[in-house]
Amino acid sequence: MSFVDGSVIVAILNEEPGFEELEKRLSDADGKLCVSPLVRFEAVAALTRLRIIATKGKADRSDLIGEARELVDSFIQALSASEVTIDSHTGVRALDAMARYGKVAGHPAALNLGDCFAYAAAKESGLTLIYKGNDFSQTDLG
């Protein structure tokens, strides 16, 4: 089983450079895929920001949010991904990740809030992490 970071969803839906490799990693993943409510939130927020920039802020933002929600929800559904729960234990692990790998800790991985929660959810559930970029490769999940 693997946990899918929001960066993967955004990269694929936005067809960013290298998105084909991410699609392959998802299709090659051994077993079920998982996300969290925070991954869903981050992906919707990122796609909305990108659409605001693309439209130079002239589109209705509530429409853009709605469209991004539909895209992300459909993508997650197409993956048949299950949603892991974020609870107080996950929060503690996210704080531990921040202290060890976070931007505020000065670690080269420079994990942000969403990254710390993705790390925590994957770690707590014993899942591998599918991600985009180099941040997680500098952690023990990389």
From Swiss-Prot:
UniProt superkingdom: Bacteria
Keyword Nuclease: yes
Residues bound to Mg(2+): D5, D115
Pfam families given in the database record: PIN
Keywords: Hydrolase, Magnesium, Metal-binding, Nuclease, Toxin-antitoxin system
Domain PINc: 3-140
This enzyme's EC code(s): 3.1.-.-
Cofactor(s) listed in the protein's UniProt record: Mg(2+)
A molecular function (GO) term: magnesium ion binding
CDD domains for the chain: PIN_MtVapC28-VapC30-like
Function: Toxic component of a type II toxin-antitoxin (TA) system. An RNase.
HAMAP family, sorted: VapC_Nob1
Record family assignment: Belongs to the PINc/VapC protein family.
Protein name: VapC ribonuclease R02377
Organism name: Rhizobium meliloti (strain 1021) (Ensifer meliloti)
